Amino acid sequence: MDRLEVLARYDIHSIEQPIRQKQWSEMARLCSVTPLPIALDEELIGVNMKAMKEELLSVIKPQYIVLKPTLHGGMRGTEEWVALARQHGIGSWITSALEGSVGLNAVAQLTSHVYGDDIEFAQGLGTGMLYTDNMPMTTEIRGNKIWIREA
């Protein structure tokens, strides 16, 4: 908790999962008293049944969840997580799990579909430029938005 208090002084948006997964009681305690919003990440991996997602969000009550579609049930699983998070008043964002350009394009389109014009902050979709042997990107970043290139 001391570390979270120190970090909170720096106007940081949030911190991703500060303890290892499978410690729901401790994570719930931290989320209830943290001075810095906590975003669950690894905790969501392998939680694919709707009832378990509901239970996790109800018990832990995080401020945010971070979704990687390839690790969280694909497009449908991600949409379900976002819908449940909204029902619980929990923020969310989508990020890549280091997909190549084809996967990143799909994640970008999913993000646009899920959030539309209601995107509140940056999503983690800038990883496609990390590869040297990637297929050409069909998307480009202009300012703070990602666009599909015209053919």
Predicted segment positions?
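Glycine-enriched alpha-helix->loop->beta-strand junction motifs that scaffold or abut catalytic
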Residues: E5-H13, R29-A39, L57-I65, R86-G91, ...
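A polyampholytic, Gly/Pro-enriched intrinsically disordered region
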Residues: K61-P69, G143-I148
